[in-house]
Amino acid sequence: MRDPVEFYNSALVPMVVEQSSRGERAFDIYSRLLRERIIFLTGPVEDYSASLIVAQLLFLEAENPKKEISFYINSPGGVVTSGLSIYDTMQFIRCPVATLCVGQAASMGSLLLAAGEPGHRFALPNARIMVHQPSGGFQGQATDILIHAREIEALKRRLNEIYVKHTGRDYDTIELGLERDNFMTADAAREWGLIDEVLQKRAEASPAA
């Protein structure tokens, strides 16, 4: 059964009607923006939303492997493995991916923000960015709990290494910074190396990014 909140939210997605020589055609707003090579991540990162993002990235690469993709992020984070599937696809495809935080980029959202093309990672002035270490819970036999604890520790190390790669900070600094929930303004995120620039106004020569 479909989640009633999801159904309600989907019913609120605006439609865009375009006129052409072949008549009218209606698109939901996100599909229309996809034609402009704009992808949105809104809400939690989980398997379904990650699959949609990955599919859009692969589609846009197939259309034009050299043209930039604009990836807008407003997310509280979510499932680590789902986020890593998006991250790996961003690094895998040939298109440069510009990232822009609107609202918030927390947890896995901040990692995806930092993973954009160097020099093309942005946030709007009132965006909030948050980094922290992965969390999880497990119940079961003591041996299984230890197995899951080792897995979370391995994920923590891997996420730290990714932040090191994209921020230019050393591992110890990253590990300390992610020890607890670490909230930042857009300017602080720039100083931290998560983004390259805080955008006040869109450049006239840049219609999408």
Swiss-Prot record:
It comes from the Bacteria. It holds the Pfam family CLP_protease. One of its GO terms (cellular component) is cytoplasm. One of its GO terms (biological process) is protein quality control for misfolded or incompletely synthesized proteins. Belongs to the peptidase S14 family. PANTHER family: ATP-DEPENDENT CLP PROTEASE PROTEOLYTIC SUBUNIT. This is ATP-dependent Clp protease proteolytic subunit.
